[in-house]
Amino acid sequence: MHYSLKSTTFAVIKWKYMITKLKLHNWKSFEDSTLYIDPLTFLIGTNASGKSNVLDAFEFLRLRLNGVTLDNAINQIRGGEDWIIQKGKHNARLEVSVEENGKEYCLKYEIFHDSNGFHEISPTLQLMEKDDYDSDTAFKVVSNNINDIFILDPIPNRMRNYSKVSKHLLKDGSNIAGVIAGLKEEEKKDLEEKLTKYISPLPERDINRMEAVTVGLTNTDAMLYCYEDWNPDVPVDARGMSDGTLRFAAIVVAMLTAKPHSLLIIEEVDNGLHPSRAKELVKVLKEISHDRNIDVLCTTHNPVLINELGNDMIPFVSYVSRDDMGNSNIQLLEDKDNLAKLMASGTVGDLMIMDRI
């Protein structure tokens, strides 16, 4: 069973087209599983459960639809050609469903391996309802949606350096200052105000302003600065900011600059953040994803963050686990057998700690 937020007033039906689910068949550690995508989705599970393999599927499809050759795309995925197809199998298939104005399209993409190497079967597209449709237009809708996927995995050490003024945020967040500085003046001011608003409750320091400033004669490089309540006239550059502050700044900027109707994927969303700030993080994720009409998929294995989601988010949480054969499986949390009975003895996070999910 799956109840989508896209059919509720939460989303106010503002979307044009959005990814609704991903099916994985013989993909890496998965034999046959489905992940449902909502405006805000959490994918939980322990380390090595297979969460990253789900994200690799999105990245692989994005690479291929952006023109990267099959062999190069495979080698850019974690594990490369040795792990992209489940052990003992010869083919892998990915299916992405995209909903556009009430119509659902499904793109099927399959690769196989033989003695001559890897090959692919031409992607097929079908309309899930019986209706006439323009296949070229439909393929463009689906491929554009996949192309717009952005996977964020901030690396604070790379965010502390000067960065070139840029239009698009990099996966590791290293050019965050350059992206902010590259905006038009009014857009830059608005983003910096929102960034300050969202980040001020989170870090250990009392931040009252955050901004990106260009440097040098040509103004082609930028640095991220913050100002603190106890020393408001002395800026602190990114080199003096904590890992948690930088990671959270990257998350906020990614959400504020993401293309409307696109899917933003954030790996280990709470990594480096103090557990006491989990509630604020969840609040920010809900607010920005709703206001900007983007879908956000977060992975986490932190019981504290999972507890902060609250029971109303249970329908939008999926968990990844391994079976006795080592296969990864995705299951909706709400479909867990005896979930209500299990939760009588503790929260979802507590159940994870006790290895009961």
What feature does the model see in each segment?
Residues 13-30:
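N-terminal pre-Walker A segment at the start of P-loop NTPase domains
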Residues 38-77, 175, 243, 248-254, ...:
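Phosphate-binding glycine-rich loops of NTP-binding sites
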Residues 93, 99-212:
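Electropositive, glycine-dotted interaction segments
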Residues 33-38, 258:
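Phosphate-binding P-loop
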Residues 40-42, 261-263, 295:
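Residue-level preference for the first positions of well-ordered beta-strands
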Residues 3, 13, 56-114:
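Conserved P-loop NTP-binding catalytic core
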Residues 204, 208-256, 263-276:
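Conserved ABC ATPase signature
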Residues 8-18, 280-357:
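C-terminal lobe/lid and adjacent interdomain/linker elements of RecA-like ASCE P-loop ATPase modules
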